[in-house]
Amino acid sequence: MKEYRTTLLYVLLAMVFLVLVAGGTAVLYAAPNSQAAPETSTINPDDILCRFGVNAVEGGTVGSLPDLGAGWYMNFTAQSNPSRPEGIEYMPVIRFQPSPVSPGYTYTPSGTALQQTIANNPGAKWLVSNEPDSVWQDNLTADVYARAYNELYHLIKSADPTARVVPGSIIQATPVRLLYLDRILTSYYNQFHTPLPADGWSIHNYILNEENCAVDPGEPGCWGADIPRDFRNDPAWLYGEVWGLKDTDRLEIFVERIMRFRQWMANRGYRGLPLYLTEYGVLFPEDYADENGQKFTPARVNTFMNLTFNYMRAATDPVLGDPNDEYRMVQQWSWYSTTDVTYNGVLFDPITLQPTAIGTNYASYTAVLNREVDFYPVSVSAGGFSALSQGEPVTATLRTRIANSGNLTAPAAAAVRFYNGSPSSGGVPIGPAQNVTLSGCGEFQSLSVTWPNVPPGRYSVYVQVTPAAGITDADTSNNVAMGQIVVGTHHTFLPTVQHLFLPPEQ
């Protein structure tokens, strides 16, 4: 078995029970070694899709990922020089191991190797741990994870201020696992006297049974995700969510967990940050049957894949979603896996490296999607001056955030300009045009301009973003945004509202 698999051992606990349910014999084997495929593909690099990703567990298929339309991948480690065929995005992962000595953990890569990896992957999205809630994976208590995250967050940010650092990657967004994350937030605040910083959150979205296997490992229901380490000795948590095999590909459960986690983010002060679904799929092999006697055939797996793709592409929420991505609930997602034939959902044959029926379905789904760029100003604001003037002009700093909610990994260019008044009705430009270059999936850039000699009054300040020549914007109705700015001459006293972080109750 391959060490980087995120859910290997806890599912293997189920195998005896599952064979009885299926009424047959499952042959489980590790993917054999195979020839590496060339780092080439037949797809235009401008066509790969940033939302669609893959968990690559065998390096020989990475060169073929763009042919699926996939725009990013992760491989449960952090490589210094990862393959990036056609400019595909790579998300490195810091892996942890519990340690009996202080600080309670070790991690890989570390030291010089980690510094070199950070330097070679500027601006990367760093996933800090893989399933820290799993007794079979990184297996950290909440206190230890908080300590480990603090070290890695500041280490990565110090080496590369443009890096994005992302916590989480729990197996599934169930109540016991959200309680585990609550304990992490509380522990972080207690240890470091500040809320846990994050540039986004990552989760996995399997639908697995939760039973405390430390209590009775022989219990037939002891399969799936188990219970996080913090709760294994807690009699109140003998069970979490209990499911059957027939439930493991139910779309409504999948959707509920996305909604639940987005609500959790909002309630904990992370509203609107990106959400990355960094692993999901159908784990049970094709010859297993659920409680209704239905096997996990390629057709069944493909149906689940298509339904989840449909949902994540379309799901938005103006309160919970990411404002930099037209309020979408999920920014990027990753299917398990390329070649791990121990489990279902395999996209490539591990020997021939040719697409399977599931891989063909993935490629067919992405092939018919429109390739889109969608630039828009997310916000317009002003600062740098006193809101009260004695009648003299002030100098204001105008700010905006420009986002691209399109679906392409390849970055696109646009020009941005501020105006006093509507640009379509004779508005006067403020400062020079500024350029941005952004990938899709909610990538954004903040811009500012100095506006000198502004007399007292009320102003409608506009920001307009214009795609570069040759780039078609999918939605031209959102290329302009407006903000009201007031330079006053009279006092109005208003109460001050402060937002404080309160650790969640246990």
Q: What role is predicted for each listed range?
A:
Residues 70-74, 84-98, 104-109:
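Active-site regions of enzymes building and remodeling cell-envelope glycoconjugates
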Residues 52-54, 73-75, 90-94, 126-128, ...:
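Hydrophobic faces of well-ordered beta-strands that scaffold small-molecule active sites
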Residues 38-79, 94:
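Boundary/entry segment of secreted carbohydrate-active catalytic domains
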Residues 1-37:
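Sec-dependent, cleavable N-terminal signal peptides
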Residues 47-48, 160-162, 194-197, 269-273, ...:
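Short helix-terminating capping/connector loops at secondary-structure junctions
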Residues 368-506:
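Extracellular/luminal regions of secreted and cell-surface proteins that mediate adhesion/ECM remodeling
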Residues 58-61, 66, 100-258, 267-272, ...:
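Active-site cleft segment of glycoside hydrolase catalytic domains centered on the general acid/base Glu
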Residues 89-93, 102, 291-300, 304, ...:
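Aromatic-rich peripheral "rim/lid" segments of glycoside hydrolase catalytic domains that contact
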